[in-house]
Amino acid sequence: MAANEDRDDAAAILNWEGTSEIKSANEYSRNLLFSVLDSLDGNKTIVWDRDRSVMHRVNLFAGASVLAAHGVVANHSIETKKSASTPHVVFFLAPTMVSLDLLCDYIDNVRNDSKILYQVFFIPEAWFVVRESLKTRAEGKYWERLESVKEIPLCWLPRDGECLSLSSPQIAARLLINGDWTHLHKCAVALNQLIDMCRGRSSSSNQRPMSIYAKGKWASDVAKMMGKIRNSAEADSMTKNLDPIEGLLKINRIVLIDRWMDPLTPMLSQLTFYGLLDEIYGIGMVNSVKVPEMEFKNEKDGDPFQEKEVYLIDEVYHRLKHSHINAVSIEASKVLAEIRDDEQFDRDKMSVAEYSVLVKKMPKIINRKKMIEVHMRLAEMIQSHVYCKQSDSIKLERDLLEYSDSDKAIPLIEDLIFDASPLNAVLRLISVHSLTCGGLKPSVLQHYRRIVNQSYGSSALNKVLKMQKMGLIREKGGGGKMQCEYAQMMFQQMKKNHDMLPEEFSEAKLDDMAYAYSGFSPLLCKMLEEGDRVKWVGWPKTVIGDKSDLIAERDGRGTCVFVIGGLTRSELAIIRENLPNVALITTSALITGDKLLNNITNI
């Protein structure tokens, strides 16, 4: 957790903590956590799950020093089986059977005083199956040892200071391959928590309204579930236990939209600075990337496996992240000019008061110089990767967006397969080929399948079949078991209707909807822009709360967007820069094409 404190210090110096909406949501989550800890009198020992995502999730809201201020005097890993001497042992666990096994093993093997109270908290939710298994295991032996079994619904995780994510990248695959609709219910529960952040929970039946607009099959289902949850006995029980934070988030409406209205964009190469960071290195839960240290330091000798972790939480990163990789130097030059201006001072003519101001400014100046150097090095590494390894693929993507033929295989895709290039890169291009032409001719699809099987093996072929089931690859006139239940995108028609390939665009202008993909405007973003322009007329609407009071509807601002199935960082940048009425962007996960495909492997 020391690293978490270092990140907190850096953020404080550079003064970038996110938008006011993100701060409000974070404050709500912190208070959920603190209310749990403060309800337990005396000192506490936290026993952390082996699944480090639980610790990472909690550390996004509170580091070691903050937890200590709420009575946490020791932190143990559940696998070390260390004994505790505090009145309470608090288990922070993921809601999985593996975590349940570790809990039972801890109870069996750790000889704590019988007076010590065991408090179990599943994060972010306590799944019914896990709870019931715990109750019945060993005829209730373990259940009886526990003082309480609850959940801490830390559902919404901050991303890049401008987005909230459920960190569930598997949702699209689970829905389309398994038909597991429980994931939509989890989205509905989380969105109801978002409403609580805005309106607060009250036992009064006269609640301020919240309008929900939905676009797509999943969105419509989630909107219905939200209403049912709100009106059910579950909602009634929630109003009896008010959350510690009420009404801080200023949102007037929630707009739900399916990722699968536009499955094409995640398959394309992102070209914004932080979009490419995510594509190439992967931005983790704690908003950091791990890069090869030798490459970062531009050294020829060293450990090729050594990695450097770079935290993306500072004000300089915030200034650069939305920029197109070809235009990132423009914004960087502005930051450098500001640093030079800050360093312009005449020591001989400065008063004591001016020296005092300078001393206070120096840490920020030094840190800004350090961070601009770090981020420009990352930009150099990204540009080198794009030009050396991705330029041909990016050009092919552009060609397919302009014109795509379903009757023949693409030579570049064939060459990449024969060269055993990274599988996901190949599959993404096949998907782009299929989606842009409205489905591949059966002979072309069979040819792709055959050569993929020859070069990568049966596991890769299985992945292709799952992509068919998800609708990422389609066969013209195809049906049967491989037919995707979700309606086809109809790219050629949508391209004309929404002007997705404008004749003129600028990579340097962030208010150009085509800048992030070098001339391509994502359909999902265009749909949101159109909806915002017409004030969501024509989008199915559900009102939660008192329907007689819709004063907030008159104000076009304060819109919250929730994308079910994932959102790319480049799309996030487009929405932030082009839709000023959108105050908060939320999603089931921030994704890349690779992350989307990786989540179908184990299904």
Swiss-Prot record:
InterPro entries: Sec-1-like_dom1 (IPR043154), Sec-1-like_dom3a (IPR043127), Sec1-like (IPR001619), Sec1-like_dom2 (IPR027482), Sec1-like_sf (IPR036045), VPS33_dom3b (IPR043155)
Family: Belongs to the STXBP/unc-18/SEC1 family.
GO biological process, one term: vesicle-mediated transport
Keyword Transmembrane included in the entry's annotation: no
Subcellular location(s) of the protein: Lysosome; Early endosome; Late endosome; Apical cell membrane
Record organism: Caenorhabditis elegans
GO terms under cellular component: apical plasma membrane; CORVET complex; early endosome; HOPS complex; late endosome; lysosome
PANTHER family, per the entry: VESICLE PROTEIN SORTING-ASSOCIATED (PTHR11679)
Transmembrane segment boundaries: none
Tissue: Ubiquitously expressed at high levels in somatic tissues including the pharynx, muscles, hypodermis, neurons, coelomocytes and spermatheca. Expressed in the intestine.
Function: Plays a role in vesicle-mediated protein trafficking to lysosomal compartments including the endocytic membrane transport pathways. Believed to act as a component of the putative HOPS endosomal tethering complex which is proposed to be involved in the rab-5-to-rab-7 endosome conversion probably implicating sand-1, and via binding SNAREs and SNARE complexes to mediate tethering and docking events during SNARE-mediated membrane fusion.
UniProt KW keywords: Cell membrane, Endosome, Lysosome, Membrane, Protein transport, Transport
Membrane topology (UniProt): Peripheral membrane protein
Lineage: Eukaryota, Metazoa, Ecdysozoa, Nematoda, Chromadorea
Classification via Pfam families: Sec1
Quaternary structure and partners: Probable component of the homotypic fusion and vacuole protein sorting (HOPS) complex consisting of the core class C Vps proteins vps-11, vps-16, vps-18, and which further associates with vps-33.1, vps-39 and vps-41. Interacts with spe-39.
Disruption phenotype: Viable, and develop into fertile adults, but their progeny arrest before embryonic morphogenesis. Defective endosome/lysosome size and fusion, and delayed endocytic trafficking to lysosomes in coelomocytes. Reduced number of gut granules in the adult intestine. RNAi-mediated knockdown results in a reduced number of gut granules in embryonic intestinal cells.
Primary location class: other
UniProt-recorded name of the protein: Vacuolar protein sorting-associated protein 33A
Annotated signal sequence range: none
Cystine pairs: none
